[in-house]
Amino acid sequence: MDFKQYSPEELKECSMIEVVHSVLGDKKQATTFNELVQEIAQVLGLSQEQVNAKIAQFYTDLNIDGRFINLGENRWGLRSWYPYEQIDEEILPQPKPKKKRKVEEDGFDDYIEEDEDDFDDADVNEDEDDDVEDLDKVLEEEDGDDDDLDDLDEDDDDFAEEELEYDETEEEEEEEL
């Protein structure tokens, strides 16, 4: 479509989408979004402020309109240029086949009785018996510490009794009033 044949009034009535469709049809190759915006601004005589105000709606319209296709890397083309099968090939990256890993043997399956060590009671070291006796002595000493706790419990009981007596005295005084 040759835009020179249109008057400025007729160009202002054209939508940005119509202009892009004509521009891409004339070029017959995919073009980046920024280049498309510059060409629209030039054809329609839009200022940078006007372009900035309309760019979001234009991008939305470009995505929604079924005549256009995004080819990736911000390149746009006409859907009629690409058969359906070719679109899938160009847009989607080819999946790479995954390599199969070899299963490593963990060595647990092979059980050999020769490797098993028999455990005998004779192998127990006598030093371990001494360690147990030392622990018993420490525990007995700690049991003596419980007497101190018992004394503290008795003090708590005495304090609780004093509080009860004090509360009873207060209640009696309140009843008298």
Swiss-Prot record:
The cross-references to InterPro entries, in alphabetical order and at most eight, read: Asxl_HARE-HTH, RNAP_delta_N_dom_sf, RpoE
State whether it acts alone or in a complex, and with which partners, per the record: RNAP is composed of a core of 2 alpha, a beta and a beta' subunits. The core is associated with a delta subunit and one of several sigma factors.
Q: Which gene encodes it?
A: rpoE
Domain HTH HARE-type residues, every copy? 14-81
**What role does it play?**
Participates in both the initiation and recycling phases of transcription. In the presence of the delta subunit, RNAP displays an increased specificity of transcription, a decreased affinity for nucleic acids, and an increased efficiency of RNA synthesis because of enhanced recycling.
Q: What is this protein called?
A: Probable DNA-directed RNA polymerase subunit delta
Q: Note the superkingdom of the native organism.
A: Bacteria
Gene Ontology CC entries for this record = DNA-directed RNA polymerase complex
Which segments carry the region annotation Disordered? 90-177
Quote the NCBIfam families the UniProt record gives.
Answer: RNAP_delt_lowGC (TIGR04567)
Entry's Gene Ontology molecular function annotations: DNA-directed RNA polymerase activity
Family as reported in the entry's similarity comment? Belongs to the RpoE family.
Q: Which Gene3D superfamilies match?
A: RNA polymerase, subunit delta, N-terminal domain
Biased composition regions of type Acidic residues, renumbered to the chain = 106-177
Q: Which GO BP terms apply?
A: DNA-templated transcription; regulation of DNA-templated transcription
Annotated source species: Bacillus cereus (strain ATCC 14579 / DSM 31 / CCUG 7414 / JCM 2152 / NBRC 15305 / NCIMB 9373 / NCTC 2599 / NRRL B-3711)
Indicate yes or no for the key word Nucleotidyltransferase: yes
Q: Which UniProt keywords apply?
A: DNA-directed RNA polymerase, Nucleotidyltransferase, Transcription, Transferase
